[in-house]
Amino acid sequence: MSERAALLAVAADPVRFALLEALTAGTTCVCELQEQVPVAANVLSYHLKLLREAGLIGAARRGRWIDYTLAGDALDRLHAALPRAARDGDRP
């Protein structure tokens, strides 16, 4: 699988897509993400780990909590990973 396809595959999962969407509002505590994306804590942790490994989000510990932030280049990287026709708005 190409790097572009792998990046899109990470973002395409419904839970991870919801997390990315929530993080477009800005830095968010994991406790708030749990409220916005109602999945079990271990499932949330797994999906956040995959997004971190893909470089789409960053994490910073604040006491016993972790704050998550959308990576500065995340949206640009996702846009660049799209097929050219999708980026240009062309229709088949």
Question: What do these predicted ranges mean?
Answer:
Residues M1-E3, E21-T24, G72-P92:
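Amphipathic alpha-helical dimerization/coiled-coil segments
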Residues A6, F17-L19:
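Pre-recognition alpha-helix immediately N-terminal to the DNA-recognition helix
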Residues A9-V15, G72-D73:
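Short helix-coil-helix linker/hinge
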Residues P14-V15, A25-C31:
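Short capping segments at the starts of secondary-structure elements
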Residues E21, S45-K49, R64:
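Base-recognition residues in the alpha-helical recognition helix of bacterial helix-turn-helix
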Residues C29, A40-V43:
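Helix-turn-helix DNA-binding motif, specifically the short coil turn and the N-cap/start of the second
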Residues E35, R52-E53:
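Alpha-helical residues within the helix-turn-helix
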Residues E53-R62, T69:
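Beta-hairpin "wing" of winged helix-turn-helix
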